[in-house]
Each structure stands twice: as structure tokens, then as C-alpha cells.
Amino acid sequence: MGSSGDVNWKLADHPKLPKGKTIGLIVLDGWGESDPDQYNCIHKAPTPAMDSLKDGKPDTWRLIKAHGTAVGLPSEDDMGNSEVGHNALGAGRIYAQGAKLVDLALASGKIYEDEGFKYISQSFEKGTVHLIGLLSDGGVHSRLDQVQLLLKGFAERGAKRIRVHILTDGRDVLDGSSVGFVETLEADLAALRAKGVDAQVASGGGRMYVTMDRYENDWSVVKRGWDAQVLGEAPHKFKSALEAVKTLRAEPGANDQYLPSFVIVDDNGKAVGPIVDGDAVVTFNFRADRMVMHAKALEYKDFDKFDRVRVPDIRYAGMLQYDGELKLPSRYLVSPPLIDRTSGEYLAHNGVRTFACSETVKFGHVTFFWNGNRSGYFNEKLEEYVEIPSDSGISFNVQPKMKALEIAEKARDAILSGKFDQVRVNLPNGDMVGHTGDIEATVVACEAADRAVRTILDAIEQVGGIYVVTADHGNAEDMVKRDKSGKPALDKEGNLQILTSHTLKPVPIAIGGPGLSAGVRFRQDIETPGLANVAATVMNLHGFVAPSDYETSLIEVVEK
């Protein structure tokens, strides 16, 4: 089913570019452009395929923005991520995104006027309101300042009992920063208690071990969260969140991402905040992917992924709706951006046959997020989506090659089959392995991604097609935190501070192949090109003029 409304789906023919060329569209996840040093894993890795797209080709290789306002985020200090990146790549326009939507709703007070808040506030008088999410200022999944505003807003509007279930980060922010975030939160909760609100932390754990799994990779992660948050059960019990985080971090090999689950107990050893009948629950992450599974456990009556033991009758709302197709959760505090008329929908209406493929951890990005936060096909007769199962139960630095080869082989076969006009893939290696902070493994990951690129480029060469190679945001190109002078930062013990997050770096885009018409080159007159410019570019290469409200195409055709 397509978008509703009276839309003229017919795209005009491009006056200079032909139809009928097979386009291989490759998105390298977490592949930015940075200075070539020992902490740039892309530089350290042998990447002959990607090098060949850049070297001596100034007209068909350039950099574009993948962070901040270019992808709908509030400021230039906001790192891009795969969700907003693929939204921009597929939509061809810039939409206010997660954090920005929430900021606007909080600033205007609209968040307290909409149906989601009215729904949960019915529990304020007699029940507890529980806030669950990532305690971080990373701005990728959540932001601490938004949680602080929610706590204040809930208390001012009648919440008498508040419990916070924290997930420590160490992925989008520095490992060890959890202690400072907990101290800040505890001070806010103490201020609420001074005003007569019963407010405290109830449970916690590291984001990668408790609650925040995605794409149904490992339900035990969600179960650990459920056990702590709902049942009040965890292997570790503490009197305060600060004691919990400090103690668990002191264990050998411990880090914020993988802290074990814990509950806060009173003097009698009883959990201070399990979720019970009549309570309200808010998951305060604004990014969708790592909240969907938990939302299913909280909302679905016929949930069967693990034994929930006890299913309380609650009022649940997400900060945002995390899956528009599943309408999950059914209640939310802030309405999502309405992304319509995506490039995929236009191309389907114009007969373009599309194949999309990645492995589990990024499959949703080349499909759901690319298509404007929409599940399913626009036209089942013209589209085929293939998901390759990701390795589960391991950290990706253990298998840094991931499924790059398998993705490339699927893409190659799709290109050579002649059945598709566009073959679109995401190669997750640079991002997923980069997040582990393992520099040597990330070098291997980048090499594997480059080999996959070569396989796809070779297939495009065979069919006389066109390649478009780009990325969704940076990560693997800079693996250390830096001081103001740009030098690698050290901690108090003199150890290198590893960077596991995304970056603010631009990403490359390259076009070429035997099917690229003579005279096609990147324009130099676009002031700040970004990911949203890619959709119109690809439409041009398919032989169409993009819709007039799309961000400008990156290419022009000059007479040679």
C-alpha cells in the first residue's frame, strides 16, 4: 500500500540521462572521512576498492554531511545515526528527527497536551510512573536533559511516586561516564523528594546486556530488563544507584555497556520499584530500534518470547512511536515525523524494480527506515527484500567480517539476474565493530566491507551498470576521543580514551561504472550537501527528474 492522498506519482524523464541502467547502491555503515592516522581504521585497513573510487576522480567522488541539521537533528554537535541517516537517504528531504521533535514538544509544552500524556497521567494519583531508558547525554538514543524535564513536568502535573529504571551507556559516550549521569539524576530525584514526591532509581544495567536489544537478536537481553523492572529481581541488589554503578564497574573487565542488571532495595531487602497493576510506564528513548522489543514485552498480550511471569495492567507510552507499521507502542508522548513520498515509493510507482539486502542488525535500515519508517513493500511485484541473519550471542569484534561476504554475494546475484533496476545494500561492519572500541577488529571489519564493495562493483561492471557508494554516518574513521587541539585524549591514568560512538565527520559518496553517461559529474555549487541530496541523485541516474521539493541532486551533466 502506498501513501494516501492525491499525489502525482509520475516522474518526468530526465532530459539528458537514460533509463534502464542497473544501479548498485551501497551504504557503508559507520564509514566517515577523517585524517589518516593510527586511530583511523579505514586508513589502516587495506581498502583498494574504496580507494579506487576516490583516487584521481574529483568529478565523481566527494564528501557530504551526515550529522546535525543535515539529517534533521537539532545542532551541529549532534552525531548522525543509522536511523536518521537512512531516513534522509530514502526520503530526499530533511525532517525534524527524534531529539528535535522531543525538544520542540517539551519547549512548547505540547507534550503535556497530547493524548499520550493524558493517558499515563491517569496513574499519577494512585499509581507510580516509571521512566525506563538510556541515561546518557549522547543524543543518539536519549538525552539526560529531556529526562530531567520530564521528571520536573510529571511532578508539577501531579505525579506523586516516580521510579527511574536506568540503562548505562558507554557506547555513544565515554565508558565510565555513567557515574556522573547517575549523580546528576540522583540530585534531581533528591530535589523532587524535598518537594514531597516519592522519587528514586529502582533498577538498572548496561544497555547491551539489559533491555536494549534490537531486531530480535537476543531476547534474553530484554528478559533481564523485564525481570529487574517489572519483577524486581536481579542478581545484584544495592541501596542506591550510585553504589550499584560504582561497585559493578569495579569488577574486572566491567564497562558501562555491559553492566549486569541490578535492583535497588530498601532496608528490608525489598525492591523499591517493581512495576505493578495501575502504574504508568514511559520509555524515554527517542530512537526506535532498541526500544521495539521491550515495547512488545510491555504491550503485547500474546507475547511469547520469554516467560514474563507476571504481566501488570499498566498504562504504557513511548517517548515516540517506535514502529509505525506495527503501531507500537499504541500510545506515545510525541508524534513521529510524517515522512511521505519517499524515493522508494516514487520509484515503485514508476516501474523501477528494487532489491534490498543486509544482515539483521541493519536490515531495517535499508527497508523500514529507508522507506520513511514504514514496514513492508510498496509493490510486492517489483520489490524483494532479503535479510541475512546476523551472528547472535557474541560481540561483533569476535567476528568482525560479519556477513559482508554473504550480503555482497546476494547483491551480485541480484545484479547479474537482470531482474532488478536498483540493488541496495547496507554493509554494517564499520559501525557495529567500531562500537566495540576494538581497533584491530575494526580494521578487519573495514577490509571485509571493502572486499564486499569490490564484489558488487565487479557485478555492476559486468552488466554495464552504475554504482553509487556512500555511508550513513561516521564511526570507524576515528576511534579515540580527542582534546581541543585534536590530539588523542588520555584518562587520569594516562590511558588512551577509546571512542565507541559515531562521529561528526562527513561521509564519502562516489558514482561511476560503465553505465554512467559521459559528462556526469558532481556539482560544486551546492552549499552544504548532505545525505538528503542522495535520493534525487539516484533518481537522476535512473533517468528521472526528482520531485521539486526534494533536496537538490548532487550531479549535473556537462557537454564534453
UniProtKB/Swiss-Prot annotation:
Query: Might you give the EC number(s) for this enzyme?
Result: 5.4.2.12
A biological process term (GO) from this entry: glucose catabolic process
Q: Where does Mn(2+) 1 bind?
A: D431, H435, H502
Pathway(s) where this gene product acts: Carbohydrate degradation; glycolysis; pyruvate from D-glyceraldehyde 3-phosphate: step 3/5
Q: Which domain of life is it from?
A: Eukaryota
Give the signal sequence positions: none
Subcellular locations according to the entry: Cytoplasm
Keyword annotations for this protein? Answer: Acetylation, Cytoplasm, Glycolysis, Isomerase, Manganese, Metal-binding
Reactions listed under catalytic activity: (2R)-2-phosphoglycerate = (2R)-3-phosphoglycerate
Binding positions (substrate): H141, R171, D172, R207, R214, R287, A288, D289, R290, K362
- Return the cofactor note field: Binds 2 manganese ions per subunit.
Grouped into one coarse class, the protein's main location is cytoplasm
The cofactor required is: Mn(2+)
Q: Which GO terms describe its molecular function?
A: manganese ion binding; phosphoglycerate mutase activity
Keyword Metal-binding applies: yes
Quaternary structure (record)? Monomer.
Hey, which family's this protein in?
Answer: Belongs to the BPG-independent phosphoglycerate mutase family.
Q: What is this protein called?
A: Probable 2,3-bisphosphoglycerate-independent phosphoglycerate mutase 2
**Which source organism?**
Arabidopsis thaliana
What phylogenetic lineage does the species belong to?
A: Eukaryota, Viridiplantae, Streptophyta, Embryophyta, Tracheophyta
